[in-house]
Amino acid sequence: MVQMKGFGILCLVFLVVFLMNVAESRRYPEFPMPYNDDYDKPFVKRCKGQDAPCSKSKDCCGEASMCSKGADGKKTCMIDKLWG
């Protein structure tokens, strides 16, 4: 009878330690959760505003904006005057 109580208490201690480890690992995950990863790889691709350097038209904000080469030879986001 005493051995069963000792075994039960030992199991209870192991269960409490296990649950504390699980709670601690959820608090400080080893692998960052997607919502915490905004610093290196943001989910939303940020678009570039007017006169920002660009490489493709889809980098620019707005439907009427496009990436075009200016007089200085650099590609920048511009709003098309006909549509914008």
Curated annotation (Swiss-Prot):
Function noted in UniProt? Toxin with activity against pain receptors. The recombinant protein (which contains an additional Gly at the N-terminus) at 100 nM shows >50% inhibition of the transient receptor potential subfamily V member 1 (hTRPV1) and slight (~10%) inhibition of transient receptor potential subfamily A member 1 (hTRPA1). Is inactive against voltage-gated sodium channels and the human voltage-gated proton channel. In vivo, is not toxic to insect, since it does not possess cytotoxic activity when assessed against Drosophila melanogaster flies.
Organism of provenance:
Telmatactis stephensoni (Sea anemone)
Q: Which residues form the propeptide?
A: 26-46
Which superkingdom heads the taxonomic lineage of this protein's source?
Eukaryota
Tissues showing expression:
No specific localization in a particular morphological structure, with a slightly higher expression in the epidermis structures (column and pedal disk), consistent with this peptide having a role in predator deterrence.
What is the official name of this protein in its record? Answer: U-isophellitoxin-Tst2
Q: Indicate where this protein is primarily found.
A: secreted
Q: Which UniProt keywords apply?
A: Cleavage on pair of basic residues, Disulfide bond, Knottin, Nematocyst, Secreted, Signal
Q: What does its UniProt record remark on the domains? A: The presence of a 'disulfide through disulfide knot' structurally defines this protein as a knottin.
